[in-house]
Each structure stands twice: as C-alpha cells, then as structure tokens.
C-alpha cells in the first residue's frame, strides 16, 4: 500500500511541475521573440561556456542515443553525486550497480554494471586512459573484491562530461570492456586564468547513515609562451553507517553467530591532487605532462566477507582498515595537420599501493581480519598507446583509425599468498614462502574504418588483435551500421566480439584458498577443498549484438534497442575437482578457477525525451532484462532489477533558476538459484527484493555570474532498504547465519544536500 502511495505522489510531483509549466509553455509560444532576446543578452562568459559544451554535445542532441550516453557537467551540477560518479552513471540506459556475483558478499560495495555483464567487465577510463587500481584488491572465492571500484578518483566538480559506451561500440577498447566503457573526461585548462572552488554537504535524515562533506578547487591559466597548466585538489569525507544500522533486519542467526550483524556502507576519506602542464609547440600540436596522487582510506563499518565478526572487527569500527595510494603519470602527444590527419599517443604509468589489515583465507574466516597488522599489495601498470586517424576521400568519405597498445601489469602481494596447507599438501606447491610476484603483458593492434557510404548510411568495420603473455591470442572483430530511414528515423545495428583477460589472481597458482566443505561445489559431506589459480585459463569472450530504432524530430526523441551478449568462457570458481591432496587420512579436493562454456545476457533499452516547452524537458529511459544466466547450470550471473526506469523532469524557470525532479523505479530482484554445492536455494535464501521507487528534487540558482547554489532532497519518500546478510546460509553445529537471498545491500533514506560552486 505504501509503495502505491509513493508511486502516486511521485507522479503528482511530475504533474505538478507540468501544471506550473503549461501556462509558461503557452506564453512562450505566444512570444518567442522575447525568449530569443533574453538569450541574446548572455554575457561573453556564458557564451564561451556554451561553445565549450557545443563541442561535445549540442543542446539539441540527445544524451541517450542507442549504445552511447553522455552526462554533462551541467547535469552533475544540478544533481551532484554524494560518494562518486557511479550514482549518476547508474541512471543511464543499461546501467545498474551490482556485485560481481550472486553471493551478496561485500553487498554494499556495489559497482557499475553495464548490460548485466558485471563490474569486472566495465572498463573505467579517465581522459581515455584506463584506471586499474581496483585490481590491486584480492579476488574472493565468489569473485567479489572488497573495493569501492575506480569511479571515485576524480571529484564530480572536475568532470567535463562522462561518456557511457555500451555493447558492440565498446569492443575496440579491448581488455575489460565486454560490458561497456565509462570514460570520465576532466575539465581542461584554457589560455586565460580561471579558478573554481566548490563544496558539497549532505545530511541524512536518519542518524545511522553516514553523511558526506566535500570541497575542492581548480586553477588553470597560461605559464608564458606556449605553455599553460591546470591544477586541482580535492578533499572529501563520508562517515561510515552505524555498526547496528541493520539491527532488526538481519536474517536469522543462531549459536555463535547470534550476536552478529551485516554491516552498512563503509565511509571513506579521499584526498586528490592532479596537475597538467601543456605545451602547444606548433599549430594543432600539443604535448601534455600529467601527474596525479590520491589517497583513499576507508572508515570501517564492520563488514566482513561472510558477515561474521571477531574482536578485531569490533575494535576497528570507524577506523581505517585499508588505504589505497594511487600515483599516475602520463605524457600525451596530440597532433593534427591541414590534411585532416590526426594522431594521439601516450604513455602512462600507474602505481597503486593497497595497504590493508591482514585477512583470513580459509572458509568462514576468509575476508575477516586475522591480525591488526597491515600488509601491502603493490600493483604497477604501464600502458603505451598510439593511434592515427586518416581521412580518405576515395569512392566515399572514410576515416580510418590504426593503432597499437602495449600494457604490462606487475603485482607484489605480501598479503594473499600465505594460506597454509590445512587440508594436506598440494602436489607441486609449497605450503609456505610462495612467491608474492605475478605479472602479465598484453600487446594489441587495432583498426577501425568509419565509412560514409551515403548521406544516410555509416558503416564501421573494426578489428582488434590482442596477445596476452599467459592466455595467448584473441581476435575481436566488429561491425556497426547506422542507416537513416527518411528524415526522422535511424536504424542502428552492431555486432562485435569483446574479451576480458583473466586477473592476476585467477592465473596465479600461488594464490590458494581453503574451505572445510561448504564452499566445495562437488565434494562430499565433510570433505574440504582448495582453490588455486590456473595458468591454463582462456580469456573470456562475448559476442555482443544490438539492434536499435530511433525517432528524432523537433527535440522529440524515442528509441528502443535490443541487445544480446553470448558470453563464452566466463571465469568462475571451479565446479569439479581437478585432483586431491597427495597424503593424509582424508583426501582434500583441489579446484581451480575455470572457464564456464556458455552464458547469456539479453535485454531491451528504451528512451523517450519530450520537449514539453522551450524551458521544460522530460527525459526517460528504461532497461528490461530478459535473460542473465549460466547456460550450463541455469544460475543467474548477478542480482540486478528485472527492469529499471529513470525519469527526469527539468524546468528552466528563469535564466538563473532551474528545478528538476527525478524518479527511478527498480523492478523485482531475484537471488541465486543454487548454493555453493549446487543444491537448490531454500528458506530465506530465496528472498526477493520487491519493486521500489526513489524520488529526488533539486533546484539550482545562479546567484551571480560567478556563484551558483544547488540544493535538493534525495529519496523524498524515504524508501529505505536494509541488508539482511549474504545470499546463502552458512554455518554448522556451532551456529548458523541463514541466507538473505537478494536482500544484501542498503538503500539510504531521505537525505538533504547543498552544493556551492564558484568560479572566477
């Protein structure tokens, strides 16, 4: 009943804004010249800002075309994210926040998932360059990492736009882009002095939810001659949720687990500094040197991989238990010539030091603190990239792109390779003193040709070759077609094979986990097992297909896209033992990471944008998932809503005042079908998350030409959800923690926020 009331109230808010906007619309139609005159009176600064925006997406362009979506700096200003940009990226077609499996482990660490392919298949870029810091975090037995992901390295106020690329169009980016790409484009410097200072504060209505404070600055300008620079710094802090936020909502717990609780969302203290020096050494030629440093330290909320606890967990609530230190350095040469030929070349070095308290690696103690001592995981990533774009006017207009990349990842893990042989010795492996080092290289070549066959036909074939030093060769062909159908309709089709190489944990035989039996899929009762890295893994591949039809006229846009990803060789924990220990009274089974032969992801995306008037715009998108399953077992690949509807109604009341309402409706979320031993889920393990909606309101006032103020309310109707535990029941004679099904994350309640942006 309450949900129905909330839906009705949400619609009333939208209709209310329509009711106020309708007479405005009528007045605009009666006096269009007035609006044109007002627009002509913008000052030079405003015009300059608009020109910068037009380079990326003209005002008449829709931001949610099939396969590609764009989020602008203006949208980020009107709807500022609290924690990181994933909060607004999730409102794009095909995007949700999920874990990397159906386990529910680290359930509040949800990350960007595109078209149901999981966070590990979402490639995060900053200014076109990959970010890989999350790979420094250990991969758990079920495929989860205790990480915030890579969406928080750039403060929202420093973002010029965010490009979200889905499906076949993402295949050209190579490793890790099988689901899609999120490209975070930062604001650039100019030839004139400019600076900004921004601050963001929010206040949750419920005191058991963590609040956020953020402030940052930027400065850019000339250095003399042909040199210029850009510098920004950021400091933000989000408090951890209260340790008992889920009290009364947890799944049943007995025996030694009776006093345990699933944790809420952890907090974070984030510090960033980034600088770029640019040299325009010739017409259309530039060289950029960039350096950045970030430190992210968590504020511990009490979370463990299996939602259990010990004294170290209790003693460290609210303290730092892991710290990420990220350094990045790059040199970029961009060149252009009068012929139209352009080139982009860069070298990037990224180093992440993941310093964290030691964790257990066996059974129920996996992912729980085993010591209050810190140990380090160091990940170094080197990337060399070069591409050239060649315009060709032969038979028809073409733009040919040729490129190459070389990437090396090296890891030194002093934390995760220490599991001893509790279940007996493993043939060919040492119980202690295993090497902490692992590495892999990828060499790539790629080509893409944008061929304008006619004024209404664009055909884009592409081919990418990757050689991985461990798993070998991979070919990724692609073909995309855009065909105009008259003046208003466009048909878009694409097919591509995308791929993802195994992680350094999955290929490392020195990375060993142990279970006393509950985690062993095919082992008998009471028989334990090991899980080892596998050097013989294949790369994951996915044949991604989409067909979309789009209608566009006079600011109206409507479209529908069908997508299907035939997923092959997905890497998961093994389903059958490859052997047993060499001695001992009871033989212990040995499993490896293995390739699942086939999986399937399929769904629909729709968009509808309505220009209600010159000042009122209504944008909508919906994603409906048709399939997401392991074709061998029938198991779901992840827990995502059956459908997701995002709707935004924005009204530019005056030149300096705008308001907007947002409405998101999540469909039913179903849990995993089978437990870790392959048996059907039972009892509370089958709990679903019912459909629910989130409504937001915000308003932005440009107080002066240099100061703007945004204030708003997230989750107006206080639609909260609590984490009940992990998906599956675990335990034994000493006690049980019963499964929570899909109820594995927190949805925060009503929150008030204010953001101040200044520039000079």
Positions of predicted regions on the chain:
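Surface-exposed extracellular loop regions of Gram-negative outer-membrane beta-barrel proteins
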Residues: 297, 469-471, 487-545, 562-589, ...
């Amino acid at each position: 009943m309450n949900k129905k009331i909330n839906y009705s109230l949400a619609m009333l808010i939208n209709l209310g804004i329509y009711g106020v906007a309708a007479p405005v619309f009528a007045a605009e139609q009666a006096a269009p010249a007035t609006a044109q005159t007002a627009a002509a009176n913008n000052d030079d600064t405003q015009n300059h800002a608009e020109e910068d925006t037009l380079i990326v997406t003209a005002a008449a362009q829709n931001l949610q075309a099939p396969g590609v979506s764009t989020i602008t700096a203006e949208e980020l200003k009107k709807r500022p994210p609290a924690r990181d940009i994933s909060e607004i990226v999730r409102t794009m077609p095909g995007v949700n926040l999920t874990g990397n499996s159906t386990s529910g482990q680290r359930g509040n660490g949800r990350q960007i998932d595109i078209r149901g392919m999981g966070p590990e298949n979402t490639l995060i870029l900053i200014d076109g360059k990959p970010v890989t810091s999350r790979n420094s975090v250990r991969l758990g037995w079920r495929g989860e990492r205790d990480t915030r992901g890579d969406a928080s390295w750039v403060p929202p106020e420093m973002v010029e736009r965010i490009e979200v690329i889905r499906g076949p169009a993402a295949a050209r980016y190579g490793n890790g882009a099988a689901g899609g790409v999120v490209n975070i484009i930062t604001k650039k410097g100019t030839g004139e002095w400019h600076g900004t200072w921004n601050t963001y504060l929010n206040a949750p209505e419920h005191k058991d939810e963590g609040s956020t404070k953020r402030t940052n600055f930027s400065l850019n300008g000339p250095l003399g001659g042909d040199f210029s620079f850009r510098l920004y710094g950021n400091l933000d802090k989000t408090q951890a949720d209260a340790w008992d936020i889920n009290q009364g909502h947890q799944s049943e717990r007995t025996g030694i687990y009776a006093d345990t609780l699933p944790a809420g969302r952890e907090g974070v203290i984030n510090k960033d500094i980034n600088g770029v020096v640019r040299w325009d050494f010739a017409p259309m030629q530039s060289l950029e040197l960039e350096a950045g440093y970030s430190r992210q330290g968590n504020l511990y909320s009490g979370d463990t991989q299996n939602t259990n606890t010990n004294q170290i967990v209790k003693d460290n609530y609210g303290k730092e238990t892991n710290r990420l230190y990220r350094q990045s350095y790059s040199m970029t040469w961009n060149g252009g010539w009068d012929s139209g030929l352009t080139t982009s070349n860069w070298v990037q070095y990224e180093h992440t030091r993941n310093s964290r308290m030691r964790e257990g690696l066996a059974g129920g103690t996996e992912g729980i603190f085993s010591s209050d001592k810190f140990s380090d995981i160091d990940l170094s990533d080197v990337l060399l990239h070069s591409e050239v774009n060649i315009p060709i006017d032969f038979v028809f207009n073409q733009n040919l792109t040729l490129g190459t990349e070389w990437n090396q990842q090296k890891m030194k893990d002093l934390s995760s390779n220490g599991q001893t042989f509790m279940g007996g010795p493993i043939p060919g492996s040492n119980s202690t003193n295993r090497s902490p080092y692992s590495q892999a290289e990828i060499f790539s070549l790629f080509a893409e040709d944008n061929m304008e066959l006619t004024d209404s036909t664009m055909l884009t074939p592409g081919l990418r070759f990757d050689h991985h030093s461990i798993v070998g060769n991979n070919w990724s062909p692609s073909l995309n077609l855009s065909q105009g159908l008259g003046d208003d309709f466009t048909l878009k089709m694409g097919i591509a094979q995308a791929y993802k190489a195994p992680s350094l944990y999955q290929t490392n035989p020195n990375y060993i986990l142990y279970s006393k039996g509950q985690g062993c899929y095919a082992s008998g009762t009471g028989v334990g097992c090991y899980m080892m890295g596998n050097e013989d893994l294949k790369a994951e591949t996915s044949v991604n297909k989409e067909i979309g039809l789009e209608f566009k006229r006079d600011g109206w846009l409507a479209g529908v896209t069908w997508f299907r990803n035939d997923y092959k060789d997905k890497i998961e924990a093994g389903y059958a033992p490859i052997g047993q220990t060499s001695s001992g009274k009871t033989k212990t089974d040995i499993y490896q990471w293995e390739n699942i032969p086939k999986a399937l992801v399929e769904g629909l995306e729709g968009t509808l944008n309505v220009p209600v008037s010159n000042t009122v715009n209504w944008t909508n998108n919906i994603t409906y998932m048709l399939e997401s399953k392991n074709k061998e077992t029938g198991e779901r690949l992840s827990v995502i809503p059956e459908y997701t509807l995002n709707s935004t109604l924005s009204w530019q009341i005056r030149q300096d005042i705008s308001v907007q309402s947002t409405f998101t409706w999540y469909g039913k979320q179903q849990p995993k079908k089978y437990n870790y031993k392959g048996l059907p889920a039972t009892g509370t393990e089958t709990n679903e998350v019912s459909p629910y909606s989130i409504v937001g309101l915000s308003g932005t006032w440009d107080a002066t030409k240099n100061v703007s103020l945004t204030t708003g309310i997230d989750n107006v109707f206080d639609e909260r959800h609590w984490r009940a535990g992990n998906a599956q029941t675990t335990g034994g004679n000493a006690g049980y923690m019963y499964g929570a099904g899909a109820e594995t994350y927190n949805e925060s309640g009503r929150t008030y926020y204010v953001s101040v942006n200044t520039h000079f």
